[in-house]
Amino acid sequence: MSKKTVANLSAADLAGKRVLVRVDFNVPLDDQGKITDDTRIRAALPTIQDLTSKGAKVILSSHFGRPKGETFAERVKDKFRLTPVAARLSELLGKPVPKPNDCIGEEVKAQVAAMQNGDVLLLENVRFHPGEEANTPEFAQELASVADLYVNDAFGTAHRAHASTEGVTRYLRPSVAGYLIEKELQYLQSAIENPQRPLAAIVGGSKVSSKIGVIETLLEKVDKLLLGGGMIFTFYKARGLNVGKSLVEEDKLELARTLEAKAKERGVALLLPTDVVVADAFAADANAQTVSVESIPDGWMGLDIGPDAVKTFQEALSDCKTVIWNGPMGVFEFDKFAVGTEAIAHSLAGLTGKGASTIIGGGDSVAAVEKVGVAEQMSHISTGGGASLELLEGKELPGIVALDDA
């Protein structure tokens, strides 16, 4: 999936041109409407600054939250407006970033017409229009009508065929990838298609069902697969072990057996924890004890991997040249059950220091490495949750397929 990028566009290609840039500014806000984490805004800066430095007029579009309703009028709510984002972006860029009250229409056309080379405009939330997620040609064409070319830098929504990620490419050429998408493809694709070996994947999270595709694909590619999180109890139950009150997906027991058999057949080392930390309730202050997976007591539930499992996992990872991590080892929101996840985060930081490529594949693992304070020590932290998983599953992402081939 080699695509043209912003780097392929010169100042001559861009000077005075109106560039529609799809970004992912879906940042978290607190109760006062203040941004609590501006990572996604900062992640888009290299693309924005490259375009403005080449004299382009940059028109940004993003979704924000999930406005509900059949019509525009029902969807428009102040809490879904991009106002705080425009303010933060203007601080980061050191210049005003105006924001119209809509993403299409006369006000937008007038503001775009008034733009000077190097100016930045942030359109209002594209999801105020039902045509965005429905990817209607009318809405896509209207959105594209104010621009000359298109850049997609929103990896987090690249797996969705929406008007602002896929529809607009039918009306704007060239359509290229921004630096963020380029980096995501470079790391995630090469990790799967052309990795330095040994290649290990660590997959956690509470449900096997949400990770089936990724586990099946990884079994075809990796040398070692380490499983943690709530999903491991489905595997234990499939082996005939008592799992107490631990989370189990009864309809996935046969699948768990199939996956274990497939790993054996392919010569992949599939590692499940040998001990777990169990609790008498799902709570931060629950009573906890460490037990072997063969002796989980009735009425108790597993909420983290145990110290022996951590040691085994660390040993298995010690010689790996590439490691992909997706999903926590336990309920890391509760400090008492965050030990396994934190230990793995520290191990990966150590491996990066030894020259290994460490890739955090989106979702909760990102929050985990940030909580531990080792985010800076990872080779790559993916900004997409579902998009990262789908790419690791080998699926084509509509928002990327639609861009010009290199």
Curated annotation (Swiss-Prot):
MF terms from GO for this chain are: ADP binding; ATP binding; phosphoglycerate kinase activity
Subcellular location as annotated: Cytoplasm
Note whether Mitochondrion occurs among the keywords. Answer: no
Look up the record and name the pathway of this protein: Carbohydrate degradation; glycolysis; pyruvate from D-glyceraldehyde 3-phosphate: step 2/5
Query: Where, in this chain's numbering, is substrate bound?
Result: D24, F25, N26, R40, H63, F64, G65, R66, R127, R160
Share what the entry says about its subunit structure, partners included: Monomer.
- Which cysteine pairs make disulfide bonds? none
UniProt similarity note: Belongs to the phosphoglycerate kinase family.
Instruction: Provide the leader sequence positions.
Output: none
What InterPro entries does the entry give? Phosphoglycerate_kinase, Phosphoglycerate_kinase_CS, Phosphoglycerate_kinase_N, Phosphoglycerate_kinase_sf
According to the UniProt record, what class of enzyme is this?
transferase
Q: Which Gene3D superfamilies match?
A: Phosphoglycerate kinase, N-terminal domain
The UniProt keywords, alphabetically, are: ATP-binding, Cytoplasm, Glycolysis, Kinase, Nucleotide-binding, Transferase
Q: Return the EC number.
A: 2.7.2.3
Native organism taxonomy? Bacteria, Bacillati, Cyanobacteriota, Cyanophyceae, Gomontiellales
Q: Which PANTHER family match?
A: PHOSPHOGLYCERATE KINASE (PTHR11406), PHOSPHOGLYCERATE KINASE 1, CHLOROPLASTIC-RELATED (PTHR11406:SF23)
Where, in this chain's numbering, is ATP bound? K211, G302, E333, G362, G363, D364, S365
Query: Catalytic activity, per the record?
Result: (2R)-3-phosphoglycerate + ATP = (2R)-3-phospho-glyceroyl phosphate + ADP
Task: Name the chain's protein.
Answer: Phosphoglycerate kinase
Q: Does the keyword Transferase apply?
A: yes
GO biological processes: gluconeogenesis; glycolytic process
Write out the GO cellular component annotations. Answer: cytosol
